[in-house]
């Protein structure tokens, strides 16, 4: 990985943090609270963090065993990012199932569309990266896979979200019929 690539990643992360901070400060000045969670949701989010930690640690242990037995399957950065993605996926799944993923008074539709759009952007960026670096180098996965893994994570979260919405609608429809 070249220095310009690492600098690009660092600048992108810094820009993303500044952008999110700007949006939150702007909305706070307007008096809008976009993250209104009740106590039940906050407790469920703590369970999500616990699941994320356990999932990431389990991934790291399994990954270490695979690397020890068969050799590295990718660079260290790709492995670390995959561990992060596994944790984020576990957190999202637990929070979605326990109705703690979105703030109160928000509909799931906008989040499902946003996650799908972000997945498509990651697929496009991954495809562009593949043209310049390729997918495999020296028998190991390259950084180009990170975007595809991110897209898979976002599509997985989207699928869990959509299934959760459909199950809840079906339950609500069943309750209406019983009454």
PLM regions: where:
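Membrane-interface segments at the starts/ends of alpha-helical transmembrane spans
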Residues: 1-6, 135-149
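A generic, lipid-embedded transmembrane alpha helix
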Residues: 47-66
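Hydrophobic alpha-helical transmembrane segments and immediately flanking/interface helices
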Residues: 68-96, 149-154
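Hydrophobic alpha-helical transmembrane segments in multi-pass integral membrane proteins
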Residues: 57-63, 118-137
């Amino acid at each position: 990985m070249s220095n310009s690539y690492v600098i690009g990643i660092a600048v992108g992360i810094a820009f993303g943090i500044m952008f999110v901070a700007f949006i939150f400060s702007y909305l706070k000045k307007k008096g809008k609270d976009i993250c209104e969670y009740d106590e039940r949701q906050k407790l469920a989010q703590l369970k999500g963090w616990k699941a994320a930690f356990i999932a990431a640690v389990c991934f790291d242990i399994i990954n270490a065993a695979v690397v020890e037995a068969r050799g590295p399957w990718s660079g260290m950065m790709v492995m670390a990012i995959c561990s992060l993605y596994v944790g984020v996926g576990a957190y999202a799944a637990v929070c979605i199932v326990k109705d703690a993923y979105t703030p109160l008074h928000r509909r799931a539709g906008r989040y499902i569309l946003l996650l799908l759009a972000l997945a498509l952007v990651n697929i496009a960026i991954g495809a562009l990266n593949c043209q310049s670096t390729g997918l495999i180098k020296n028998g190991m996965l390259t950084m180009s896979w990170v975007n595809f893994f991110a897209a898979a994570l976002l599509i997985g979260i989207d699928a869990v979200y959509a299934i959760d919405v459909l199950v809840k609608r079906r339950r609500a429809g069943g309750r209406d019929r019983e009454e």
